[in-house]
């Protein structure tokens, strides 16, 4: 089985069990990304963060794979000989499957391409589940807060909701095992399981503790959220998965009935997804037989076009697209097509800039090889790879939303001079501690602000930015970002 993928996220950003062999970004380059869904683990078996973009396997240029030359056959024989030798003659017994996986993984790593990777059976399963948006679990959003695992909310009609799970329930045990102080991803692994099996959660609600048995089931995570703000329809599109276009079309019909005639398509921090859904989504606004994206490999070009007329409801609407540096791949395909066809104005900040395509080959054992195969261009032929898409009108995010993630394995104190100190200053200033953030120097003013911060949040008051202070600092910044959206507010004011 073969598919084509645009990998749709920062290739150097560590992802939890999705795209798990992407190179880990050094802590010096990480950025805190603020968007509610990025800080909540859904108990659906995986962490929802990344996706791939699938291109139909019928594209002609994806089939042109030549046979092996004589020299190439010799190289294959060498690999086969090495495999047989190590498997049969090494002084310790070897796992044949792991040897072959290591060989494939080694070939992929030699490409030095962060978008190419070899996935094991389990990694492939998780990846495919993420692309489809269907998962097996209990359907409850949860987060870690002050060492406690707290339910943010059960999803509507989910097993968790039907079992009586409520927002702010604190999970203390899973199947009788304490989860107090455990990392969130470990708790997710305990809660996940096979469809139809039961998990027992011990939850604390107020001063009472109770056990709740929940039967795991299949859950679909919606990728489109709609709200009406000042008579403007705001559609947050988290990623492009199965039926994203259908969800958006239904929401647009509802908005049209509500009298909405101006809409914002919020693609900020949308890492991408299924190309087919990006094309279908563009088709809501763009008429039949219009190019949405061009795929190129060498001298071959394939244009992917719309297949239907645009939605009548969408034709009545003024469309604005909101993007940022986290808008990648399928988000850029859609944004580029909408702008080239003059169907929307683009606001926000420059997009990620992912203009190459990956294809996949699945092995009989369920593992998968993904590698870069071609590039894509916008309908007008623009190559955005490494450049991104510049907005028509720039709306900058608050400074604290793009600070570096501060390593927790180091404590910062008076005399330190590093960009992390500047991040601390920017963050504390955003939290209301009136810190001058013009320099990277850890000065006495910052020390005083940290002491005040520590005192107000029941931390050890030492004036040092230590691990516990760092964790509380990050938690509060995330909460602040999730409560306010100055970029969207500014755009709404422009559109009124």
Swiss-Prot record:
Compartments it resides in: Cell membrane
Region Disordered: start-end pairs: 1-26
EC number: 3.4.21.-
Active site residues according to the UniProt entry: 329 (charge relay system), 340 (charge relay system), 354 (charge relay system)
Disulfide pairings: none
UniProt keyword Transmembrane helix, yes or no: yes
A single Gene Ontology CC term: plasma membrane
Recorded topology in the membrane: Single-pass membrane protein
Keywords in alphabetical order: Cell membrane, Hydrolase, Membrane, Protease, Serine protease, Transmembrane, Transmembrane helix
A Pfam family per the record: CtpB_N-like
PROSITE patterns, alphabetized: PDZ
Domain PDZ: 124-206
Transmembrane residue ranges: 39-59
The organism's place on the tree of life at top rank: Bacteria
SMART domains: PDZ, TSPc
Keyword Membrane: yes
GO MF terms held by the record: endopeptidase activity; serine-type peptidase activity
Class in the EC hierarchy, top level: hydrolase
Residue spans of biased composition, Basic and acidic residues class: 10-25
Cited InterPro entries: ClpP/crotonase-like_dom_sf, CtpA/B_N, PDZ, PDZ_sf, Peptidase_S41A, Peptidoglycan-bd-like, PGBD-like_sf, PGBDSf
GO-annotated biological processes: proteolysis; signal transduction
PANTHER family: CARBOXY-TERMINAL PROCESSING PROTEASE CTPA, TAIL-SPECIFIC PROTEASE
Family: Belongs to the peptidase S41A family.
Name this protein carries in UniProt: Probable CtpA-like serine protease
Organism name: Staphylococcus haemolyticus (strain JCSC1435)
């Amino acid at each position: 089985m073969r598919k084509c993928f645009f990998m749709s996220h920062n290739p150097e950003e560590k992802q939890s069990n999705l795209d798990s062999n992407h190179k880990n970004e050094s802590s010096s380059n990480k950025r805190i990304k603020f968007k509610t869904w990025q800080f909540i683990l859904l108990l659906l078996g995986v962490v929802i963060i990344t996706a791939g973009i699938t291109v139909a396997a019928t594209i002609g240029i994806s089939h042109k794979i030549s046979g092996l030359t004589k020299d190439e056959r010799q190289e294959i024989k060498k690999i086969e000989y090495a495999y047989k030798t190590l498997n049969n003659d090494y002084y310790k017994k070897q796992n044949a499957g792991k040897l072959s996986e290591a060989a494939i993984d080694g070939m992929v790593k030699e490409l030095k391409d962060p978008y190419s990777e070899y996935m094991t059976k389990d990694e492939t399963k998780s990846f495919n589940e993420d692309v489809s948006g269907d998962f097996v679990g209990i359907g409850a959003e949860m987060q870690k807060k002050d060492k406690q695992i707290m339910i943010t909310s059960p999803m509507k009609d989910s097993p968790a909701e039907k079992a009586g799970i409520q927002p702010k329930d604190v999970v203390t045990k899973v199947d009788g095992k304490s989860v107090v102080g455990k990392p969130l991803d470990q708790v997710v692994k305990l809660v996940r399981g096979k469809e139809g099996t039961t998990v027992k959660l011990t939850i604390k609600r107020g001063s009472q503790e109770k056990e709740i048995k929940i039967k795991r089931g299949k859950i679909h995570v919606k990728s489109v959220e709609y709200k009406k703000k000042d008579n403007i329809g705001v559609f947050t599109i988290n990623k492009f998965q199965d039926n994203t276009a259908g969800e958006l079309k239904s929401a647009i019909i509802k908005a049209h009935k509500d009298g909405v005639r101006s809409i914002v398509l919020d693609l900020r921090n949308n890492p991408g997804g299924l190309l087919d859904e990006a094309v279908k989504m563009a088709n809501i606004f763009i008429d039949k037989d219009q190019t949405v994206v061009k795929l190129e490999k060498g001298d071959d070009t394939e244009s992917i076009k719309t297949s239907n007329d645009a939605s009548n409801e969408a034709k009545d609407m003024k469309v604005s697209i909101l993007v940022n540096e986290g808008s990648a791949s399928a988000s850029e395909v859609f944004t580029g097509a909408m702008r080239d066809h003059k169907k929307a104005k683009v606001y926000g900040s420059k997009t990620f800039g992912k203009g190459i395509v990956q294809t996949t080959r699945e092995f009989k054992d369920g593992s998968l090889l993904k590698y870069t195969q071609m590039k894509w261009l916008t309908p007008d032929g623009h190559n955005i790879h490494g450049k991104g898409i510049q907005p028509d009108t720039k709306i900058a995010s608050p400074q604290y939303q793009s600070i570096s993630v501060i390593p927790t394995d180091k404590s910062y104190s008076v005399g330190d001079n590093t960009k992390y100190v500047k991040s601390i200053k920017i963050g504390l200033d955003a939290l209301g501690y009136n810190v001058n953030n013009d320099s990277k120097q850890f000065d006495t003013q910052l020390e005083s602000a940290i002491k005040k911060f520590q005192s107000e949040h029941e931390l050890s008051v030492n004036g040092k930015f230590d691990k516990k202070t760092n964790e509380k600092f990050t938690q509060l910044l995330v909460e602040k970002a999730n409560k306010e959206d100055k970029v969207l507010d500014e755009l709404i004011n422009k559109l009124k």
